[in-house]
């Protein structure tokens, strides 16, 4: 005889109300309490940005926000590859809500903006609905990420103004979509190119405020005025890159673990990967490319056709200034 327990009821209620299952049973105080630490554990070198974001979310969850607005409207600014999108992704995981992401490079033309709220009656695609309005209708509790917002057509900003101010949007059918339980995050690289330039003479230390000037140039006053916070992200230092190397290696260990392969990487090899992949202007992305090119590609050959097809151990070290791989087939040693 099957019995229905509390967890089953919570899941059904969560589906009907379209809210995260976690929010049904537990107060999210514990989640908010550890929010800052949880984010710092997975995104490195952005302590100030994470602190500002966590404080802003706690403020809104404490009931001190205006009830008709979204939970928060945040603009993440900073150079490429420093963790802006990753913070939004990890925030959705920590809060247990859906991440709804739109790349604004797809909405550079005026006509493409109508895809977000749906085409008006009489136009092609009227029956399909808007991508943004449909997504929020299906996931009213979510982190809405608009990536590289500066690439979007100016008409999109006019649509966002009402969302940021009143927490509602009307789609092409006249249906009102509720944004009041949405955390709206927009990312921008505005000013990153200015920050990358070397300052002349005594102005060398004053580069940190340049992205504010670029944001002021790029976004209208009424748009900036509706933001809860502009959260600047700093470039990654060499010390932070070494921690990112550790993160990539841990991810690789998990991937290899599924194939019964263990990995050992010496400190010299870790330092080599870090120095090879460090570029202060491009953040962690060059590092990911170095790991893929110099570590994953040689391993892929061995996993598919070589000495790791049945599992084993791989030791990575430095030899003659390059990475060297030493493979041990555990099956062979066990039988011997």
Task: Briefly describe each language-model feature range.
Residues 1-336:
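AAA+ P-loop NTPase nucleotide-binding core of proteostasis motors
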């Amino acid at each position: 005889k099957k019995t229905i327990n509390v967890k089953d009821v919570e899941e059904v209620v969560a589906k009907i109300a379209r809210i995260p299952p976690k929010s049904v049973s537990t107060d999210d105080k514990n989640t908010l309490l550890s929010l800052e630490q949880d984010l710092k554990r997975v995104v490195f070198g952005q302590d100030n940005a994470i602190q500002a974001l966590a404080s802003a979310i706690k403020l809104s969850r404490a009931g001190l926000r205006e009830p008709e607005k979204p939970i928060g409207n945040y603009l993440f600014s900073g150079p490429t590859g420093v963790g802006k999108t990753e913070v939004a992704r990890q925030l959705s995981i920590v809060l247990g809500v859906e991440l709804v992401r739109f790349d604004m490079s797809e909405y550079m033309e005026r006509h493409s903006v109508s895809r977000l709220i749906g085409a008006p009656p009489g136009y092609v695609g009227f029956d399909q609905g808007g991508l943004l309005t449909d997504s929020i209708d299906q996931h009213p509790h979510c982190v809405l990420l608009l990536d590289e917002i500066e690439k979007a057509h100016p008409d999109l900003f006019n649509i966002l103004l009402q969302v940021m101010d009143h927490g509602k949007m009307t789609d092409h059918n006249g249906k009102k979509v509720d944004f009041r339980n949405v955390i709206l995050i927009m990312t921008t690289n505005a000013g990153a190119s200015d920050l990358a330039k070397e300052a002349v003479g005594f102005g060398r230390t004053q580069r940190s405020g340049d992205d504010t000037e670029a944001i002021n140039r790029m976004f209208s006053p009424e748009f900036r005025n509706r933001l809860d916070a502009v959260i600047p992200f700093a470039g990654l230092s060499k010390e932070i890159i070494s921690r990112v190397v550790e993160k990539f290696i841990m991810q690789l260990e998990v991937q290899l673990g599924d194939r019964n392969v263990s990995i050992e990487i010496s400190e010299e090899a870790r330092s080599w990967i870090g120095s090879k992949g460090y570029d202060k202007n491009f953040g962690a992305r060059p590092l990911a490319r170095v790991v893929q090119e110099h570590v994953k590609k040689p391993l892929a050959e061995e996993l598919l056709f070589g000495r790791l097809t049945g599992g084993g151990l791989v030791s990575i070290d430095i030899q003659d200034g390059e990475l060297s791989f030493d493979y041990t087939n555990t099956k062979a040693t066990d039988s011997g």
